[in-house]
Swiss-Prot record:
Protein name, per record: Phytoene desaturase
Native source organism of the sequence: Fusarium fujikuroi (Bakanae and foot rot disease fungus)
Pathway: Carotenoid biosynthesis
Gene3D superfamilies per the UniProt record, alphabetical: FAD/NAD(P)-binding domain
Cellular component terms per the entry's GO annotation: membrane
Gene this protein is translated from: carB
Length: 570
């Protein structure tokens, strides 16, 4: 480890960027963050209007251990930084087409009563079995995926990966796994809609992701008082105390490459200024980075063709009065459940009857709205942008019974349709007409997500988390050619979501430190594992282990590819 401070430029002040920057500053690096917008947080930011506050993106704090851990690693705590986490109870109200609802809760007594009302006395026992399985998915994923890097196919041959591969059901969908425990269509829907957190259909999302249902049901849904951005704000403050420099309203035109050394040597700003650095980390959308900030390559083209998550039309409504029928988190499920997901993820369209999420931050935190009023966020999932040969986009179902528009994507009409559908659905199911209560409306469309945050195709959660888009198959945290160029954020390993990006910041920061010559006991937050006794495969020689891992890694890759391309396709 050199005594000379290495300089680091981080592109993008999203969660992954500010987390990685703070960690590297803690280790003594000189870090500068460049952000194109005039605010930090990326999608994890706030929108304000006349006393109303809205979370622009994430509004549910899950996997709290990663939030506590990063502040502990930085020598502080959420409490010390003024972040107060509020528990949302109930978790959700889930509304169905017949006007009935289901209340999700961490309270086992309430869940027992609600589940037995639908599936009888045996239903609760099966629910406990579902919790047991999802708990296993949770613990294995946290320790073997969210805390580990997967730089190559060889990584798939790790003993803990091989041992747990079929225990976490990556080759079955969440819907398939839930159907083994819940016998009614209603409860299957209740316990699978959460795959939307990954931007995926429950009929395609690997069963492993039931870990999200576990963290909600066991740990609860939390919300930072003052908005989700309070967490980002605290990380920014810690970073600044450690020496991180933030330069907002500073766009990056390209990552500069020294052809003589084959390394990144800084960035070129939008105004043409060159900023040098020893290390570059891009927390910008990964597909955007490869296609807009780096020299064009066939790999960049292939990334553009990868499966991505969905987009959304998001409404931010300032309501003139409190709407008591709505809790902090509300889900309205389409009657044609599978068909609505197929419209989004297979046809990349907007469903004629979408499922949608309604967040009322003022219900859990009254400071989100003026007294006597509510702030309401409605997120309607839609297909990501698809450009056709004429440069237009299509996005609304054109099936004969869909009520859709015969259009190459008239977004004004599509937004109007989404708004009308949401208002009509809520009027029918909860008996409240929101239309006359809306004093002000702000809208984010797929184009907003694309233009404001450089999200490829307006996909709000980056690349998909399908089986061939995770672990060693997901774009790596280090560029294959420019070894001092690294990546953070939703589309690299381990994946999307605020806690996952925070977990990823630890992975990439430790990778950078080790590449810079740090030993385990020199990493500020790491325990010294150099004296740990070796056993099992660790006793093998390096060359033997590499060959063994290579064989197993290749075998796993072949089996997964075969399943995905042959069996799943049929």
């Amino acid at each position: 480890m050199s005594d000379i401070k290495k300089s680091v430029i981080v592109i993008g002040a999203g969660v992954g960027g500010v987390s990685t920057a703070a960690r590297l500053a803690k280790a003594g690096f000189k870090v500068t963050i460049l952000e194109k917008n005039d605010f930090t947080g990326g999608r994890c930011s706030l929108i304000h209007n006349d006393g109303h506050r809205f979370d622009q993106g994430p509004s549910l704090l899950l996997l709290p251990r990663f939030f506590h851990e990063i502040f502990q690693d930085l020598g502080t705590s959420l409490t010390a930084e003024g972040v107060e986490l509020l528990k949302c109870e109930p978790n959700y109200n889930i509304w169905f087409g017949d006007g009935s609802s289901f209340e999700m809760s961490t309270d086992l007594t309430k869940m027992k009563k609600a589940i037995e009302a639908v599936e009888g006395i045996d239903g609760f026992e099966r629910y406990l079995g579902f919790l047991q399985e999802s708990h296993r998915h949770y613990e294995v994923s946290v320790e073997s995926v969210l805390r580990r890097n997967f730089p190559s196919i060889l990584s798939l041959a790790r003993p803990e990966v091989l041992f747990n591969l079929f225990n976490i059901h990556p080759l079955e969908s969440i819907w398939t796994r839930a159907s083994k425990y819940f016998w009614t269509e209603r409860l299957r829907r209740v316990f699978t809609f959460g795959s939307m957190y990954m931007g995926m259909s429950p009929f395609d999302a690997p069963g492993t992701y039931s870990l999200l249902q576990y963290t909600e049901l066991a740990e609860g849904i939390l919300y930072p008082r003052g908005g989700f951005h309070k967490v980002v704000e605290a990380l920014v403050n810690v970073g600044q105390r450690l020496g991180v420099e933030y330069r907002l309203s500073t766009g990056v035109k390209s990552i500069s490459i020294d052809q003589a050394t084959g390394k990144a040597n800084g960035v070129v700003l939008s105004d043409g200024t060159h900023l040098p650095s020893d290390i570059v980390i891009s927390n910008a959308d990964l597909v955007y980075t490869y296609n807009n900030l780096l020299p064009k390559t066939s790999y960049a083209d292939s990334l553009s063709k990868r499966e991505t998550s969905c987009s959304s039309i998001s409404f931010y409504w300032s309501a003139s009065k409190i709407v008591p029928e709505l809790n902090a988190h509300n889900i309205f499920l389409a009657d044609e459940y599978q068909e609505s997901f197929d419209s989004i993820f297979k046809e990349h369209l907007i469903p004629s009857e979408p499922s949608f999420y309604v967040n009322v931050p003022s219900r859990i935190d009254p400071s989100a709205a003026p007294e006597g009023k509510d702030s309401i966020v409605v997120l309607v999932p839609v297909g990501h942008l698809l450009s056709d040969s004429e440069g237009t986009h299509r996005g609304l179902s054109k099936s004969g019974n869909s009520g859709g528009l015969e259009t190459s994507q008239d977004w004004d009409k599509m937004i109007s349709l989404a708004r009308d559908t949401v208002i009509a659905t809520m009027r029918a199911r909860i008996g409240v007409d929101l239309a006359p209560l809306i004093e002000n409306e702000i809208i984010n469309t797929p184009f907003t997500w694309q233009e404001k945050f450089n999200l490829d195709k307006g996909a709000i959660l980056g690349l998909s988390h399908s089986i061939m888009n995770v672990l060693a198959f997901r774009p790596g945290t280090q560029h294959s050619k420019y070894k001092n160029l690294y990546f953070a954020g939703a589309s690299t390993h381990p994946g999307t979501g605020v806690p996952v990006c925070i977990a990823g910041s630890k992975i990439v920061a430790e990778q950078i430190l080790k590449d810079s010559g740090f030993k385990n006991n020199q990493i500020p937050w790491a325990q010294d594992t150099t004296k740990s006794p070796k056993g099992g495969l660790d006793k093998m020689s390096d060359s033997s282990l590499t060959l063994f891992q290579g064989f197993l890694g290749a075998l796993v890759a072949i089996l997964l590819a075969y399943y995905y391309l042959v069996i799943a396709a049929n």
